[in-house]
Structures are given as structure tokens and as C-alpha cells.
């Protein structure tokens, strides 16, 4: 196996969770500017598309990264072991430092086809996928949930995953059925760690679910002795979630991150065409907590280009500056 970067990380380490249509190279660089985590994962990349002669072009943008993002982990999904084997070799050649297997996506058209969290119901296939993914020599990790239907599934399922000799297991502390509709089951962390210690003490344990920031993650790590913390939706409420010394951030700083996002979108659009509409989901992250925020968000949602968005920001910030001088 190539160098296992997981073994060199600080304890606890912090990861930005892979999120579909969110954690692309643009947003990862914005987060890095605000407060960098220890590890970045890509967006979800489908193994079948990657292995298809034509499909490879459709996933290229999902696998784009730069050297300053290392250690970079490719987050991939599917259900055919031979495709994971082929893709693992290709990802190693591309310079990724690790491969993370999606066994937790709850979306119906994924899970009900036996992929993502659907693999919880197909444990033997899950094991075959894990072993096949080691072909490229990269450390293999898994992101999953407590179970599919019921929380009581967690022990048998996680025991099975721990037995596969993986580098890291990230657990979203909910079942597939629960989606994100209930509080994450932090009460199970201690028992899960005990199981890990018994079955696979060399496998790192990362916790995910309802963790808003680094400080909360540190509290959980100190309380339970877990190795890593993964933050997902918390980044939407606070782009500075990974900040080591938290402080209040001004609206100017947030709008500055939005300007950076626009510039990076423009930069990487030259390499890989990106749809401007995909930017709209990010506006609410940066435009909030200030007078006129609702109106500005509404206006930004109706823009059709980077130039239009910048013009709106220029006008809005000029008004902000004028009010502050009164």
C-alpha cells in the first residue's frame, strides 16, 4: 500500500464531509481560506460513469483538485466491485491520497438500487467492494450510517465493516430511514468506540452528525476518545466552522468569501465548464445577519452571470459603507 496519510494526521483530525453539488474544488478553496480542515473529500463520483468510455468526461470536474488541497480523498459510489477496482487504480495515478467509499447516501434512487446506504443491506457486496478498492494501493476508508431501517442494526453492520481492515470509518450517527430528521445518536459513540477497539483497533473512527464546529468536535473527541470529526451541514451555517480560535466575523468578511467564491468559480470554469445556476445554493451561506440580507439574496438568486452578481455586491456594499459613515 502507498503511504497511509491517515496515520500522520493530528488527533483529533477534522474533515469537511463530502456533499453532492457542494464540495467541489471551488467551495473547498473557500473553506480553506476561511478555516481549513485537515482532510478534504471530493463530491460523490460514480464508479460506473468513471469506468464508461464516455462517462469519464462527465465526472472529470468532480475529481478536479489542486496540490494545495492535499491530502485529497476521492469519495466514490456504486455497487460493482470490478468498477471500484478499476477506479482505485486510476485514482492512484491521478495523485489522490485516499479513497472513501460511500455506503451511507440515503437518497431513494441510490439506496433502493442497492448503492450508498443500500449496501448496508448487502454486506457481502460491501465487503467485496472494500477489498476491490485496495487494488490501487491507496488507503481505503468508508462513510456509512448506523443502519438502514433500525438503529439496532448498528452493531452487526459496523462489526462487519470493521472486519474489512480499512484505514478510517466515518459514521453518520443516523439510520438511512431517519435521514436527517432526528438528532444524531451521540449516545452510541462510546459503544461504537468499544466495538472498534475490540474488532479493529488500527482502524480510525470518525464521527459525523449535528457537529456545528471545531469546538463541539473537540468536546466529543475529548469525551469519547474518537480519532476524527467530520462536519457537513454545519459549514452552511458557519463557513469558519473549522476555526481553531473562534471569533465573531463581520458581514464584510462573509461578503468577502462570496467574492472569493465568485472569483474561484470564474477561474475553474475556464478548465471545466460550470453552470452559473449551481452557485445559487451558496448565496445563503454568505449573505445573512445584515440589514438588507433577504433582499440581496433574492436579487442574487435572479442573477445570470458573475458580472451581475459582482455588480449587486458593489452596490450593496457601497450602501453599507455609506450607512456606516452617517
UniProtKB/Swiss-Prot annotation:
<feature type="binding site">
    <location>
        <begin position="232"/>
        <end position="233"/>
    </location>
    <ligand>
        <name>FMN</name>
    </ligand>
</feature>
<dbReference type="Pfam" id="PF01207">
    <property type="entry name" value="Dus"/>
</dbReference>
<dbReference type="GO" id="GO:0000049">
    <property type="term" value="F:tRNA binding"/>
</dbReference>
<keyword id="KW-0694">RNA-binding</keyword>
<dbReference type="InterPro" id="IPR035587">
    <property type="entry name" value="DUS-like_FMN-bd"/>
</dbReference>
<comment type="similarity">
    <text>Belongs to the Dus family.</text>
</comment>
<dbReference type="InterPro" id="IPR024036">
    <property type="entry name" value="tRNA-dHydroUridine_Synthase_C"/>
</dbReference>
<keyword id="KW-0820">tRNA-binding</keyword>
<keyword id="KW-0521">NADP</keyword>
<comment type="function">
    <text>Catalyzes the synthesis of 5,6-dihydrouridine (D), a modified base found in the D-loop of most tRNAs, via the reduction of the C5-C6 double bond in target uridines.</text>
</comment>
<protein>
    <recommendedName>
        <fullName>Probable tRNA-dihydrouridine synthase</fullName>
        <ecNumber>1.3.1.-</ecNumber>
    </recommendedName>
</protein>
<keyword id="KW-0285">Flavoprotein</keyword>
<dbReference type="InterPro" id="IPR018517">
    <property type="entry name" value="tRNA_hU_synthase_CS"/>
</dbReference>
<dbReference type="InterPro" id="IPR001269">
    <property type="entry name" value="DUS_fam"/>
</dbReference>
<feature type="binding site">
    <location>
        <position position="143"/>
    </location>
    <ligand>
        <name>FMN</name>
    </ligand>
</feature>
<keyword id="KW-0560">Oxidoreductase</keyword>
<keyword id="KW-0288">FMN</keyword>
<feature type="binding site">
    <location>
        <begin position="208"/>
        <end position="210"/>
    </location>
    <ligand>
        <name>FMN</name>
    </ligand>
</feature>
<dbReference type="GO" id="GO:0017150">
    <property type="term" value="F:tRNA dihydrouridine synthase activity"/>
</dbReference>
<dbReference type="InterPro" id="IPR013785">
    <property type="entry name" value="Aldolase_TIM"/>
</dbReference>
<keyword id="KW-0819">tRNA processing</keyword>
<feature type="active site" description="Proton donor">
    <location>
        <position position="105"/>
    </location>
</feature>
<dbReference type="GO" id="GO:0050660">
    <property type="term" value="F:flavin adenine dinucleotide binding"/>
</dbReference>
<feature type="binding site">
    <location>
        <begin position="18"/>
        <end position="20"/>
    </location>
    <ligand>
        <name>FMN</name>
    </ligand>
</feature>
Amino acid at each position: 500500500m502507498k503511504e497511509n496519510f491517515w496515520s500522520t494526521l493530528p488527533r483529533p483530525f477534522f474533515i469537511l464531509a463530502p456533499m453532492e453539488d457542494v464540495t467541489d474544488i471551488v467551495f473547498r478553496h473557500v473553506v480553506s481560506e476561511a478555516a481549513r480542515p485537515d482532510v478534504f473529500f471530493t463530491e460523490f463520483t460514480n464508479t460506473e460513469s468513471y469506468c464508461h468510455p464516455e462517462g469519464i468526461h462527465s465526472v472529470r470536474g468532480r475529481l478536479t483538485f489542486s496540490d494545495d488541497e492535499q491530502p485529497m480523498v476521492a469519495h466514490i459510489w456504486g455497487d460493482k466491485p470490478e468498477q471500484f477496482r478499476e477506479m482505485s487504480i486510476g485514482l492512484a495515478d491521478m495523485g489522490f491520497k485516499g479513497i472513501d467509499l460511500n455506503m451511507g447516501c440515503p437518497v431513494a434512487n441510490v439506496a433502493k438500487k442497492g448503492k450508498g446506504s443500500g449496501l448496508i443491506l448487502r454486506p457481502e457486496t460491501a465487503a467485496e467492494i472494500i477489498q476491490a478498492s485496495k487494488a490501487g494501493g491507496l488507503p481505503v476508508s468508508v462513510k456509512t450510517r448506523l443502519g438502514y431501517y433500525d438503529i439496532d442494526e448498528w452493531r452487526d453492520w459496523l462489526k462487519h465493516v470493521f472486519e474489512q481492515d480499512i484505514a478510517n470509518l466515518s459514521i453518520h450517527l443516523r439510520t438511512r430511514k431517519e435521514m436527517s430528521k432526528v438528532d444524531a445518536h451521540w449516545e452510541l459513540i462510546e459503544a461504537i468506540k468499544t466495538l472498534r477497539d475490540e474488532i479493529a483497533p488500527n482502524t480510525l473512527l470518525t464521527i459525523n452528525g449535528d457537529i456545528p464546529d471545531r469546538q463541539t468536535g473537540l468536546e466529543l473527541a475529548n469525551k469519547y476518545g474518537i480519532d476524527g470529526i467530520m462536519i457537513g451541514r454545519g459549514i452552511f451555517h458557519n463557513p469558519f466552522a473549522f476555526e481553531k480560535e473562534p471569533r465573531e466575523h463581520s458581514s464584510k468578511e462573509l461578503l468577502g468569501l462570496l467574492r472569493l467564491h465568485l472569483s474561484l468559480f470564474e477561474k475553474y470554469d475556464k478548465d471545466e465548464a460550470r453552470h452559473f445556476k449551481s452557485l445559487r445554493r451558496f448565496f445563503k451561506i454568505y449573505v445573512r445577519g445584515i440589514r438588507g440580507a433577504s433582499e440581496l439574496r433574492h436579487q442574487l438568486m435572479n442573477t445570470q452571470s458573475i458580472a451581475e452578481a459582482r455588480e449587486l455586491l458593489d452596490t450593496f456594499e457601497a450602501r453599507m459603507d455609506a450607512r456606516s459613515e452617517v
